[in-house]
Structures are given as C-alpha cells and as structure tokens.
Amino acid sequence: PYGVKYIGIGNEEVLFNGDRADEYDHYVERFNLLHDAIKGKDPSVKLISTAWWRADSPSMERTFRALDGKADYWDYHPWADQLASGREVEAELRRMRELFLRWNPSTTMKCVIFEENGNRHDMQRVLGHVTLQNAVRRMGDFVLTSCAANALQPYRQNDNGWDQGQVFFTPSQVWGMPPYYAQQMAAAHHRPLTVGCGVEGADGVLDVTATRSREAGSVVLHI
C-alpha cells in the first residue's frame, strides 16, 4: 500500500569482520529467504544486494552468481572526501560493470550507491561529491542513483562518529552545509539524458558532463 519500489536487503553486510566467505554465503542464504517472501507479496519490488563490494575477493563472483536474477542492484559505498573521488569511483564502477558482464554477459544486475561517505562537510567534500556525480552520469543507466550521506547532523551534539551532515540543526535553527547546496543544484537542474562532451586544453583539471531534456529543449553542463 506504500508504493515501495526498492528494498535493500541489509546494509553494509559482510563488512566488519573482513572478507569472510562464510559470511557472504550466509548473506546469500538470508537474501534468498527474504527474496521469496517479498516477491511472493509483490513481484514488482526491486531488491538490492548490500553485501560489501570487494572487487578482488573470490567471494564476489560466487555471490554474484547466487544473486544474479534475484538482486536487481548491488549497493556500493565509496569514499567521497577527496578531490580524486570521482576518478577513483568511476574506475571502480567500470570494473564492477566489466566483472558483472564477464560473469554473465546477459546479466541485468546493475549498481546503486546508497551512501557516499566521508568525514567532512566543507567545499572539499562538495568537489568530491560533484565529481562523483559526474562519474555516475558517465556510467549511464548502470548506476541507478548516488546518495550523499549523511542527511542530518545536530550542531555540536553529533555522537555517531560521522562528521558529514548535509543539514545542520539546533532546536531553533536549520541550515545547509556546502554539499546540501550542491545537491540542491543537481536536483533543480536534473536532465535525464546524457550528452557526449569533451574538454580540451584544461590539463585534466576540469571534470565536465552534459545532460539534456527528453525533448532536447534544454542542455545542462556540470563543471
């Protein structure tokens, strides 16, 4: 009755004890049980694997093969604090896509980024976030969405270890931090279709993508 379209099974599973094959196998077992229960009620719901992505782990192929056709997406949580975050994440996304297609050339599994993480909320984090957004745009429909953490942070009362709130608040005030405004700009000027573009003479210092509306009535540059 709530119109839920996507459900992630868990969050950052098989992370805290390292790369353990038995924990990946246990995750697959639990995923399958929940898959059958959810799909039995609503076959249209898209399910998301949240097993921690480790591209070099032998458990990745085994987990992928066990969930291929059941998980629509694999949740990937990159670090987004650095100026090079966009380039690094784009390389990892391309590797993920390459591995998926190597393991099954006909797979429909794709990626979703439900958390871009970091420990800052300043202009450097803005640049990490927006270059990561450009990386996602260049990946086309392989990546469903990318979400910057965290949404809220109580001013001088934060006790969860993360210092990356987009919106700070007190009992009487609410204000956005720089990443909030970058996200606001991206949402306000979203266009669904990517346009090919290139940069010359910038010595690699500019990261640029372009998108347009379906009717081709407007083009947005992300620089």
Regions found by a protein language model. Give the residues of each.
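Aromatic- and acidic-residue-enriched carbohydrate-binding clefts of CAZyme catalytic domains
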Residues: 1-17
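Short, solvent-exposed loop/turn segments at the edges of secondary structure
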Residues: 2-4, 69-71, 106, 162, ...
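Residues that line or immediately flank small-molecule/substrate-binding pockets and catalytic motifs
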Residues: 11, 78, 150
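Short acidic, glycine/proline-rich loop/turn micro-motifs
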Residues: 17-20, 159
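Noncatalytic carbohydrate-binding groove/subsite architecture in carbohydrate-active enzymes
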Residues: 19-133, 139-142, 194-205
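Aromatic/acidic polysaccharide-binding cleft in carbohydrate-active enzymes
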Residues: 109-218
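Asparagine-centered strand-capping/turn motif at beta-strand->loop junctions
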Residues: 221-223
